[in-house]
């Protein structure tokens, strides 16, 4: 496919590319390259393309897209063009858009200009729109010699197999129910034929009572089995929802911190619903449809026994309707994905606003925020409206098809009765069978509509389930030990960055920190201090070099030992609605009360807690809203101390405290004898550290004690003047 398209490519024209939606704002370039490769016949998962294009918290660069395209076997050329020059380039190509986005240029069709936007889907634009948004940077692609195509695996089939694994008994029971339900569907049309031909026309009134009794028994039989089948489906649905929900959340919370830093919390919470929707689709839509098709096959056999001609007419019209529905399905799939993305942005924006109400009110920005939120909501409404139009059109197809089938069958069947090829009872029975056959087939319209939504749900779930877990959860090669760490830390030639295709942010970083000593990272904003603290805690994995705890590489230490030995106090305070005890212990019931009290005393928060109603069982509001900023920060410090850590990492942990309280807490921490890594802008927090490392653009520019550094001209002298 790729080679044929390569030969037929010429300047201008139109190329319809497959739509790949970005899951986060920073991966538009990766999604665009997936679309271009998909057009040439090579389907690459978005999660793989993220890595290949070096997507970081700052997105991806055009140069990264070019290098990735070449690795996948494409010829890539970058140009600087105006709109007139763009119209002469072969399509598809990738455009830099609005100086902060990438889109796929599909070209011109008639009088319309098309782009495929990974954030919004396919868009029809005017030349003025393109001129105002196109920055002039364009990347052109063509299959190189040796380019190979690859088909995307059927994720829906794989998902069905994975989720129904171990449910053979339930599926078998449902199939048995389907077989039993075939009987009344086949018998009732026969009863209709007997009633018309033998009782009404034939005059055998003696048969009336027996036939009526048999029909009542059949209806009761059908109702009983339908009820039992519904119970089985409900049980299977609940079981699948619980199991898949557990697996989803289990995997979600084992993902690296970088995953969460690039996504809205509201969007992630919506994906829990997406995961549940997939399970509901399996049991309510897929299972029901498979049973309907199974039953329809038996109706079809009996229909051919009655009249092959009428059966052939009915099948032809049904297949025609299915063909039309299939051609509508792809558009519904893309629109469903767009709706879910817009809903995720809206919910994420709403949640962000609810967590920053103080800031909004203090700055008087309520109207601006509401306007921004209304923009998200309007996008949701527009997307839902477009999807609704398509879905309503698809709903109409089976209704029109069923009416057309009924009219034609009645017309042709009437001729057959007049010619003596059928009796009136046979035509009535056939019509009943045809209705029973077309009803489940007509329900395929709803199924096709729902399967497109399920594919969109699955894409958003797969974005999480295919993401590689945090390396800290890998158990291979870890030592078998249960004792806490002593607290010796050594970093040897550490390099790290947020994009594998860019220069490292941290490079050549080394230090040796003996047990019980302290070190501070200082520097201007963006110098890499917080990044370095996260590397020390194991949240970020270095590209090069080693982190040694007590002389053993960090990756060989059991995760449980690291969690109990290393505590971190972040500059972002995280408190949830619950008791103070739960906030301190994170629901760990094995932490003794004495350790909780001692930690709170060292954090200078114990007296405040005991004065609250219920003391340690006092319920905090969401985010600790019923505490002051300094109180929340002290509670965060106490949380880090309850496990009696050997290593304490503090990132701006005392920024909201007054100097007297700050000094008391630092003295209490030193008395504990734990190794300390401190990131701070305040001189009082770092002046007594055993070593101070001054950072600039990820590199060490000065190091030494406070007394040594304050005498040396350079960064540190300038920093302490502003502290």
Description of each model-found segment:
Residues 213-222, 226, 288-337, 409-422, ...:
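Transmembrane helices of ABC transporter permease
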Residues 531-534, 564-572, 580-583, 599-603, ...:
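ABC-family ATPase nucleotide-binding domain "signature/switch" substructure
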Residues 184, 196, 205, 273-317, ...:
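Hydrophobic alpha-helical transmembrane segments of ABC transporter permease domains
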Residues 192-193, 253-298, 355, 361, ...:
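Juxtamembrane loop-to-helix connectors within ABC transporter transmembrane domains
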Residues 459, 463, 548, 556, ...:
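ABC ATPase nucleotide-binding domain helical subdomain, centered on the C-loop/LSGGQ "ABC signature"
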Residues 1-188, 201, 205-210, 229, ...:
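Membrane-integrated ABC transporters
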Residues 342, 346, 358-365, 389, ...:
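Cytosolic ends of transmembrane helices, especially the final helix of ABC transmembrane type-1 domains
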Residues 537:
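Helix-to-loop junction immediately C-terminal to a conserved catalytic motif
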């Amino acid at each position: 496919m790729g080679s044929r398209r390569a030969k037929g490519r010429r300047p201008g024209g139109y190329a319809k590319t497959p739509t790949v939606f970005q899951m986060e704002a920073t991966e538009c370039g990766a999604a665009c390259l997936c679309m271009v490769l998909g057009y040439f016949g090579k389907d690459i998962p978005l999660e793989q393309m993220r890595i290949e294009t070096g997507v970081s918290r700052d997105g991806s660069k055009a140069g990264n897209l070019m290098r990735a395209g070449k690795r996948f076997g494409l010829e890539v050329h970058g140009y600087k063009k105006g709109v007139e020059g763009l119209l002469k380039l072969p399509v598809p190509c990738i455009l830099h858009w609005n100086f902060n986005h990438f889109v796929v240029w599909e070209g011109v069709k008639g009088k319309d200009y098309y782009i495929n936007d990974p954030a919004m889907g396919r868009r029809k634009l005017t030349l003025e729109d393109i001129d105002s948004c196109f920055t002039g940077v364009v990347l052109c692609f063509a299959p190189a010699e040796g380019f190979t195509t690859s088909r995307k695996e059927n994720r829906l089939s794989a998902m069905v197999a994975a989720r129904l694994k171990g449910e053979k008994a339930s599926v078998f029971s449902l199939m048995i129910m389907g077989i039993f339900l075939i009987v009344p569907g086949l018998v009732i049309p026969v009863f209709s034929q007997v009633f018309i031909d033998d009782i009404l026309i034939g005059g055998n009134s003696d048969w009336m009572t027996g036939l009526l009794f048999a029909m009542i028994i059949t209806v009761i039989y059908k109702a009983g089995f339908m009820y039992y089948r519904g119970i089985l489906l409900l049980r299977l649905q609940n079981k699948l929802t619980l199991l898949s929900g557990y697996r989803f959340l289990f995997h979600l919370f084992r993902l690296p911190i970088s995953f969460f830093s690039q996504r809205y919390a509201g969007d992630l919470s919506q994906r829990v619903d997406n995961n549940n929707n997939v399970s509901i689709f399996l049991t309510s839509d897929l299972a029901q449809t498979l049973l309907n098709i199974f039953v329809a096959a038996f109706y079809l056999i009996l229909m051919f026994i009655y009249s092959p001609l009428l059966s052939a007419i009915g099948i032809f019209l049904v297949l025609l309707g299915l063909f039309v529905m299939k051609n509508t399905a792809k558009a519904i799939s893309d629109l469903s994905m767009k709706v879910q993305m817009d809903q995720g942005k809206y919910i994420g924006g709403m949640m962000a606003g609810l967590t920053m109400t103080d800031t909004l009110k203090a700055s008087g920005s309520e109207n601006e925020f509401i306007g921004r939120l209304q923009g998200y909501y309007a996008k949701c409404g527009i997307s839902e409206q477009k999807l609704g139009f398509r879905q309503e059109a698809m709903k109409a197809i089976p209704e029109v098809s069923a009416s057309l089938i009924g009219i034609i069958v009645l017309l042709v069947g009437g001729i057959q009765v007049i010619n003596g090829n059928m009796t009136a009872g046979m035509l009535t029975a056939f019509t009943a069978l045809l209705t029973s056959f077309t009803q489940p087939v007509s329900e395929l319209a709803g199924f096709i509509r729902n399967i497109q939504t399920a594919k969109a749900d699955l894409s958003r779930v797969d974005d999480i389930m295919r993401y590689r877990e945090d390396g800290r959860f890998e158990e291979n090669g870890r030592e078998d030990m249960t004792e806490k760490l002593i607290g010796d830390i050594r970093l040897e030639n550490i390099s790290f960055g947020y994009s594998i295709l860019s220069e490292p942010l941290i490079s050549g970083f080394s230090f040796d920190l003996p047990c019980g000593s302290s070190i501070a990272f200082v520097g201007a904003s963006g110098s890499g201090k917080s990044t370095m603290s996260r590397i020390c805690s194991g949240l970020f994995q270095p590209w090069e070099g080693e982190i040694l705890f007590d002389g053993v590489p960090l990756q060989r230490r059991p995760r449980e030992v690291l969690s109990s030995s290393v505590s971190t106090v972040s500059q972002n305070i995280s408190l949830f609605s619950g008791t103070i005890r739960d906030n301190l212990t994170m629901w760990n019931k094995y932490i003794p009360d004495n350790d909780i009290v001692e930690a709170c005393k060292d954090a200078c928060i114990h007296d405040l807690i005991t004065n609250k109603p219920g003391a340690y069982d006092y319920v905090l509001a969401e985010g600790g809203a019923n505490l002051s900023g300094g109180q929340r920060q002290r509670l965060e410090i106490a949380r880090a101390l309850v496990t009696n850590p050997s290593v304490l990492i503090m990132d701006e942990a005392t920024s909201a405290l007054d100097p007297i309280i700050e000094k008391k807490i630092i003295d209490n921490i030193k008395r504990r004898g734990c190794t300390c890594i401190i990131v701070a802008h305040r001189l009082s927090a770092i002046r007594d550290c055993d070593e101070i490392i001054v950072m600039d653009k990820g590199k060490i520019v000065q190091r030494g004690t406070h007394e040594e550094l304050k005498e040396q001209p350079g960064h540190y002298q300038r920093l302490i003047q502003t502290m």
